[in-house]
């Protein structure tokens, strides 16, 4: 059986508001990213078998940012489950004692992996393809948890337009910042199915150049949608002016 690993596609930024744009297989999760707050001690996610005819197995596990499987900080329960046609089940993510060793002043990134395993077929000369996906899982320590109705704002991300027209994003926040849109008039300059993620208290530069002095950015928020901001950069190599755009999807 061949395994088709789509982690690079998903992690690169297909985690946008429209799940229909993602090439999920039969098994789909109920969200495109996971936020785990320290005070909650765990989180739950629903998986649905979209097939109306076939049962599937779903295998789940946690990986670190280097792609290593890990049970030290978070475990999935159950790690393997059968879903009958059109069935929906719940997967729990439970923190372990070692979670206390993670930084208290910033998010830690993990990946929640789900692999769907189809039933064996009696047909000859048929290759079965098993889909595997990875969702970003952000563990958020108590010191930086948002209120229940809190909405992430991104004004603390400094944006600088450089001489060559490339853009630098200085992330002054304790959260991972993911850009799903950089462009003008609804046309993104990001390569297709890609995004740009800036880790807490760090910076990242765009690989593309010649960005105009006025443009928009869309940050992927906690709900998987895009929060848009208007950017105006009258002077190169200086911090740009930022204001909330009149749309939020």
From Swiss-Prot:
GO terms for biological process: cell wall organization; chaperone-mediated protein folding; DNA damage response. The keyword Lipid metabolism does not apply. It is found in: Periplasm. Gene3D superfamilies: Immunoglobulins (2.60.40.10). One of its GO terms (cellular component) is outer membrane-bounded periplasmic space. Keywords: Chaperone, Fimbrium biogenesis, Immunoglobulin domain, Periplasm, Signal. PROSITE patterns: PILI_CHAPERONE, PROKAR_LIPOPROTEIN. Residues 1-25 form the signal peptide. The keyword ATP-binding does not apply. GO terms for molecular function: protein folding chaperone. SUPFAM superfamilies: PapD-like, Periplasmic chaperone C-domain. Could be required for the biogenesis of a putative fimbria. Belongs to the periplasmic pilus chaperone family. This is Uncharacterized fimbrial chaperone YqiH. The gene is yqiH.
